[in-house]
Amino acid sequence: MAAPSLASYDGSAGVLVDTNIWVDCIDSESAWHNWAVEQLQACSEKSPLHINLIIYTELLVPEPDVHALDALLDVYDTQRSPLPWSCGALAAKAFGLYRRRGGARLLPLPDFFIGAHAAVANLTVLTRDRAGYVTYFPRLAVLAPEVLGG
């Protein structure tokens, strides 16, 4: 399988919602709760929201409540999107860059797969961790708070 071409990437096929946004939406005590809910609402009115198996799994740890999670995702008509095989090569490439820059992890982190999924599926990422994505996926369209740490 050839590495995916991102020549036509513009993030216009929808929004892949990162784990931290869903966590903030669930946690009414989070400093980011209102922002997360506002972003989910605004994004869902403009384009389809997406979640993949990695994000879904992260949201079920430590206490799985599949019914509650599915109900929340359904509120925003969130599509459960499969990881395309082509994102494997892109995630590996990004992870290689991470290792060359001194990253200590020996196996790719979930965000590498999430970023690669967004890139090959032409999705924008909604997250609080802009730097974590644009560092390794510089062409990726990212919606994040415009503050330190966002």
Residue ranges and their predicted role:
Residues M1-I51, V61-A71, L143, G150:
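Short, well-structured N-terminal submotif of metal-dependent ribonuclease cores
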Residues A2-D10, Q79-T124, R128:
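Active-site neighborhoods of divalent-metal-dependent phosphate/nucleic-acid chemistry enzymes
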Residues T19, L53, P110-F112, R130:
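Conserved glycosyltransferase catalytic-site signature
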Residues N52, Y56, V66-L69, G88-A92, ...:
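A general structural signal for well-ordered alpha-helical segments in protein cores
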Residues P64-S86:
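Active-site-proximal, substrate-binding regions of enzyme catalytic domains
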Residues Y76, Y136-P138:
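Short, structured coil segments at secondary-structure junctions
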